[in-house]
Amino acid sequence: MLAPVLLLLGAALTGRGMEADLPATGDYAALELYTRLAAQGRQLLGPYSRFGFHHPGPAYFYASVPLYVLTGERFAGILLTAALVNVVSIAFILRRLGRDGGMPALVAGALMLALFLSWRGPAWLFSAWNPNVAVLPFGVALVGFAAVAAGNVRALPLAVLAASFAAQTHLGALPAAVAIGLAAALLHVPLVRRAAGLPPAGPAAHWSLLLATVLVAVVWTPPLLEQLSPEGGNLSHIFGFSSLPGERHSAGEALVASGAAIVGWMVGAREGVATGLLVVLVAALAVAHGVARVNRQPFPAALSLVTFAGIAAAIVSAARVTGALLPYLLRWMAMLAVGGVAALASALGPLWRRRAERWTRPRLAASVGIIALALVSGRNLALARSVLQGPEPVPSEESRSAARLAEAIDAGIATTSRRPLLEIAPHTDRDLVLGVLLALDKTGTRFAVRPFGPFRLGGHWTPDGTEDARIVVGHEDADLAARPGVRLLGREAGLFAYLVPPV
């Protein structure tokens, strides 16, 4: 199953990029700017959101720092980090399913993950976009908390770390991450545990609880520090935004969108059919729990309940999304289908084994599953090869424009300013501006920049009163250009940079 991933990863390590080496504009430029701050230990915010706040925390940026530095501060390091996170997540998911759920859960989980990669394309594993990076770590959290609920408290540290990473990287995963964690905790309450048909929990592994607590403290300290700082308040902004009484989606809309995101992708189902498939998945969870309860199988029983909690949280989250229910916002929900199918396979495993004893070909069922997995993985391998055989990606014209304008700004202030303040005019092409800022920083140009749009570039870019000039970046401004001493430094793709001398 991992052959396509390893093929692409090996190609990337030998110099074949999955994307242009420096997609120096837009979202990727913002990700790289924040990673550069993390390399200095100054990044306290998560990825920016189009709604004006930032996602809850910077775990993704700090995870990207080692490979970013090792690759010479190239964007390829962030792409490789995304691939590494995904490959390791797949390995952890399959390891947990195999250890606690047995061979049926392992084969079913591997088949579902292979189908997911076939749907998205193997190159998706190299996507550095934060909604994509959060998907597979959420899957690690799902199966990890299921193991904790089943009685394996040693799985708690990894489950907490994966849930925190997914929630900090993409806010949409936060409610479900909290829900599955709470479900696992509730299933350790003796009364709830008996009602759920789970065996009594063994003695608590104190080192696991201690390690999980330390991980939570370390991972969540940066966003808490930002919240408590005088110029901070991102977590309050998130809470306030989520509490706004604005337009929300109906239960029907949430069910349709959630059904498509959770299970519809498996068969390319339309919205109406996807809702029906979601009902089938919930019924399968009920069957899995009932069978596991009868056969006294703690892991599939716990996995079915934890997955159900995740589905409920996913539907509620979809109902509270502001604006259109775009697929990328809900993509993390696909891991709930992986959990549901694995729970059903694990629960039915003993029944299949007992029936197989009466068959003349007792390994037929396992063989069918492995053959199906091989077929899907073979298709993924073919897709990966087609990616590698395609033309090398080249930087876009927007990237070239950003580099040229940054070069003009750097040349214009080399002898006139030690540290200018950049002001971004309203209604400016933010994608291009981000590329300019990234290119300036990579050349070693010292500058400060005021927050603009949803972007808050702190650290060494924070204005501190030492700025000795002002650069206004925006659309052409004839009135500003006519002022005494104002000089046009450069213009590219409709973006103008004016040097305004100090008053």
Question: For the regions a protein language model found, what residue spans apply to each?
Answer:
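Membrane-interface transmembrane helices that cradle and orient dolichyl/undecaprenyl
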Residues: 141-158, 191-195
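Membrane-interface alpha helices of multi-pass inner-membrane proteins
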Residues: 156-173, 177-184, 215-218
